[in-house]
C-alpha cells in the first residue's frame, strides 16, 4: 500500500495536527456515552431483583436463533429482509468502523489477521456489506417517508410519531456507509493516478463507484476528501452511538442482552407495585 495521501494521523490544518481531533472526538464521545448509559441503567439497578442467569444453554440458543439468525424478522417480509441486511451489515462493518477510529491515531493500524488472506476476504465482504446496507437504508427511508405502511401509523392510543427518529437513524447509517466508502475511494484513486498497484475495491460497490468518479480529480481534491470523509465518519459514528440510548432505537445496543435475559417461561410476569417510596426501592 503506497501512502500517497496523508492520513488523519499525520495531516494538519493550518498547522494544527488533525490527530488531536482523532483523540478528542472518541474520548469525549465515550465519556458522554458512559454518562448516558449510567442514567439509563439507574432505574434498572433500583428495580426488584429477577434472577435470569438460569439455564445458560437455552439462553445461548436464543441468542443464536433470535438475535444472530434474526428468526422473527421475516414476519413482516419487506421490513424484515431490510432489517436483516442492515443487521448483518452492521456486524461486518463494526470491525471496519473500529479500525478507522484507531487509524486516525495510528495510520498503519490493522487488526491482527487482517493483513493476511483473511483481510482480503473481510474487506471484500465489507465493501459489499456497505453497499447492501446503503441501498437497504434508501429503500427503508422511501417506505417510511413516502409509502408509510399502515402499521407505522399512529392512533389516538399511540399519538407519538417516531418517523423523524427513524429517518434520522437511517440518515446516520447512510452517512456512515458513504463516508467510509469515500475515505477509501479517494486513496485508491490517488494510487491509480500515481500508476502504482491500487488497493482492491470490490466491483459494483460504493467504494468502486466513488473511485471511478474521483480518478480524474486533482491530488489536492483527493487529499481533502480523504480527510473530510474520515472526520464525517468519526463524528457521525459517535453521534449515532450517543443518540441511540435516548430513543426507541436503543435496542440496537440492548437487543443481545434483552434476548439472553428474556423470560423462558410464559405467564410469570410479576405485577407492578405502585406507591413504592424511594426508601423502599
What are these regions (language model features)?
Residues 2-281:
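Membrane-embedded alpha-helical bundles of multi-pass integral membrane proteins
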